[in-house]
């Protein structure tokens, strides 16, 4: 399998179509928010998009998983939260739009994303997990991510129920160092520009082990606004 940086408009359009299909399969029918303050299409346009393919001859239409990555120089932070100004914007990354259409494919494309981030001297990596409906929390927890602030509304997408609530999570410090080290040991080959990562057998990424006693760290307290929103949606 291989992970490719999607460089053409056609490839990136296929990514967006597959992302939408993955969300619809999970019954999360989101639409892009585009107004004077927020533009989800601009966010994706500024991001690097990566797609997973079963082999080097696979066309764009055969993309089976994907994810988006940007640093804060490429596009501003998408959700509010604790201060990160102690680090250069180019060293703080956001991972988003992580989707998969095949078992295990989501993990493989994330391995590709980890390799891309690890080679850029990262200081922090952010992700936003859907509150109450994300099946990725266990995976991100195993990678070393921890909650970062309280749940917030992700205003770049909306559904009939309004803006989705997400839990910001962050990878930093020792956990990030372990990810960088583990990424360098993954079995892959690439070109000089790192535009394509071809995986060899034995792909496995386990940089961080979370003690079961600390699992409670993911049981974050929600804001009153989130609780009120959930009560309103339940009564709708």
Task: Please tell me what each predicted stretch does.
Residues 156-192, 199, 204-208, 214-215:
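C-terminal "cap" of GNAT-fold acetyltransferases
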Residues 79-165:
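Acyl-donor binding region in acyl/amide transferases
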Residues 10, 117-123, 184-202, 226-228, ...:
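C-terminal/domain-terminus segments
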Residues 58-60, 137-138, 176-179:
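Short, surface-exposed beta-strand/loop "edge" segments at domain boundaries and coil↔beta transitions
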């Amino acid at each position: 399998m291989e992970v490719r940086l999607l460089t053409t408009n056609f490839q990136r359009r296929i990514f967006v179509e597959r992302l939408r299909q993955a969300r619809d399969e999970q019954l999360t029918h989101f639409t892009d928010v585009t107004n004077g303050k927020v533009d989800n299409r601009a966010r994706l346009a500024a991001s690097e998009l990566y797609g997973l393919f079963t082999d080097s001859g696979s066309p764009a239409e055969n993309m089976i998983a994907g994810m988006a990555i940007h640093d804060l120089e490429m596009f501003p932070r998408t959700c509010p939260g604790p201060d990160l100004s102690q680090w250069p914007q180019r060293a703080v990354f956001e991972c988003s739009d992580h989707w998969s259409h095949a078992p295990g494919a989501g993990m493989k494309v994330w391995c590709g994303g980890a390799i891309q981030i690890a080679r850029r001297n990262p200081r922090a990596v952010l992700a936003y997990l859907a509150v109450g409906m994300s099946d990725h929390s266990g995976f991100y927890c195993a990678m070393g991510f921890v909650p970062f602030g309280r749940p917030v509304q992700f205003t770049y997408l909306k559904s009939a129920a309004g803006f989705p609530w997400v839990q910001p999570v962050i990878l930093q410090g020792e956990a990030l160092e372990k990810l960088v080290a583990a990424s360098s040991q993954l079995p892959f080959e690439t070109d000089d520009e790192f535009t394509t990562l071809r995986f060899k057998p034995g792909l496995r990424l386990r940089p961080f082990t979370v003690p079961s006693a600390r699992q409670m760290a993911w049981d974050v307290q929600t804001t009153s606004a989130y609780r009120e929103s959930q009560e309103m949606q339940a009564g709708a």
